[in-house]
């Protein structure tokens, strides 16, 4: 929808994204969301006392205290105990949804300032044993379940997420070569942007423990900028014989968090905040679960229609790179301009910590739009189960 009130982003930060089992593996989703939230509050000069609501997205609920996640984030960063909090889950769209939910609170005048965010520790996803709470028979073989792996299959259609991407490859005639070439581009674009310092304004450095002692993590850990086409071509398809999806052209399993603080126009004036961007509108759509990766197509189209804008108006476009064939299917369907889409690399390079990605994409668009002097940008993601979500922002510089 197009917003009923002026809603502005006054701070947007994210942690570096950690590789699976990497530097962030010992931090809970709550820890990482706290790091991002503290950085956002500081960057936006937002006093915790002015925050009216906390909305944090999280998918896997991987820590023992995850049921308290958003509440604990708020309390840890000094937001008053009287301020409510909610943890939400729209799978891969949860980071975006936190912003959408925050906008809805502001538009309904339930809140004036909202701390939004998304966080995920895929490294901490637990193993579990089901159906033993009420006893087991002698000799029973207990099945240990990897919740991370099983969660990547949509049981309603009995289909792993990667197969939904393979379905799009067939439908849109996308080749393995196309996918590997796009994956290489994602890695190369990330390296160029990172070397130029384009991620600096969005980054919330994290102090981590290593064998060499404590160090400050300021750079994403997952990217492999030295990747070559030859290396990508040698990787075997993961889910389908002669398929297109490999470990090299799919988004990386990773850890990370982001925080975006939004405020009404009245709050911006009252607290003398510096608006970085205006939230123009958003749209959420369902789609066929067997091709869930096409979700950004109806989501972006819907957001543009609701706001009276077109793709030509967009200076930057971000489509979360769940899988290379998924992204390429969206690019084909919308006839996206590659020169302004995922300009600094995406999840194939950076990793895709589920709920963290929407917050990362939003934070990146805010700062990159300002760096380039552009006006409009749209961020989007496909969502497991068959949905898509998109948010349009406008540069206020």
Swiss-Prot record:
Catalytic activity: an acyl-CoA + acetyl-CoA = a 3-oxoacyl-CoA + CoA; 2 acetyl-CoA = acetoacetyl-CoA + CoA; acetyl-CoA + H2O = acetate + CoA + H(+); propanoyl-CoA + H2O = propanoate + CoA + H(+)
Modified residues (Phosphotyrosine): 127
GO aspect biological process, one term: negative regulation of mitochondrial outer membrane permeabilization involved in apoptotic signaling pathway
Keyword Disulfide bond attached: no
Binding site for CoA: 224, 227, 251
Subcellular localization(s) per the UniProt record: Mitochondrion
Annotated pathway: Lipid metabolism; fatty acid beta-oxidation
Protein name: 3-ketoacyl-CoA thiolase, mitochondrial
């Amino acid at each position: 929808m197009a917003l009923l009130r002026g809603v502005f982003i006054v701070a947007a930060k994210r942690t570096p994204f950690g590789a699976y089992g990497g530097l962030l593996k010992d931090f809970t989703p709550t820890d990482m969301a706290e790091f991002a939230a503290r950085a956002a509050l500081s960057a936006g000069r937002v006093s915790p006392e002015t925050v009216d609501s906390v909305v944090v997205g999280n998918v896997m609920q991987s820590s023992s205290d995850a049921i308290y996640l958003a509440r604990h984030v708020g309390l840890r960063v000094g937001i008053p105990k009287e301020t409510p909090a909610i943890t939400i889950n729209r799978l891969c769209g949860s980071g975006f949804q936190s912003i959408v939910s925050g906008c809805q609170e502001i538009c309904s005048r339930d809140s004036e300032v909202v701390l939004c965010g998304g966080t995920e520790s895929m490294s901490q996803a637990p193993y579990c044993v089901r159906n033993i709470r009420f006893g087991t028979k002698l000799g029973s073989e207990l099945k240990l379940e990897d919740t991370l792996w099983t969660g990547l299959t949509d049981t309603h259609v009995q289909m792993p997420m990667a197969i939904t991407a393979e379905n799009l490859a067939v439908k849109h005639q996308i080749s393995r070569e196309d996918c590997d070439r796009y994956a290489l581009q994602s890695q190369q674009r990330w390296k160029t942007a990172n070397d130029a310092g384009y991620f600096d304004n969005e980054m919330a450095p994290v102090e981590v423990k290593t064998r060499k002692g404590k160090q400050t993590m300021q750079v994403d850990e997952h990217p492999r900028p030295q990747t070559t086409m030859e290396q990508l071509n040698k990787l075997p398809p993961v889910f389908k014989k002669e398929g297109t999806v490999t470990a090299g052209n799919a988004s990386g399993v990773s850890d990370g968090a982001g925080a975006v603080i939004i405020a009404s126009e009245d709050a911006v004036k009252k607290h003398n905040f510096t608006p970085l961007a205006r939230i123009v509108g958003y749209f959420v759509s369902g789609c066929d679960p067997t091709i869930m990766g096409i979700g950004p197509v109806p989501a972006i189209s819907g957001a543009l229609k609701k706001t009276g804008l077109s793709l030509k108006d967009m200076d930057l476009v971000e489509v979360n790179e769940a899988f290379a064939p998924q992204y390429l299917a969206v690019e084909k369907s919308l006839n996206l301009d590659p020169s302004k889409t995922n300009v600094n690399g995406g999840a194939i390079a950076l990793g895709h910590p589920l709920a963290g990605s929407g917050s990362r994409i939003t934070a990146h668009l805010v700062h990159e739009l300002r760096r380039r002097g552009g006006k409009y940008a749209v961020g989007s993601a496909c969502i497991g189960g068959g949905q898509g979500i998109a948010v349009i922002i406008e540069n206020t510089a």
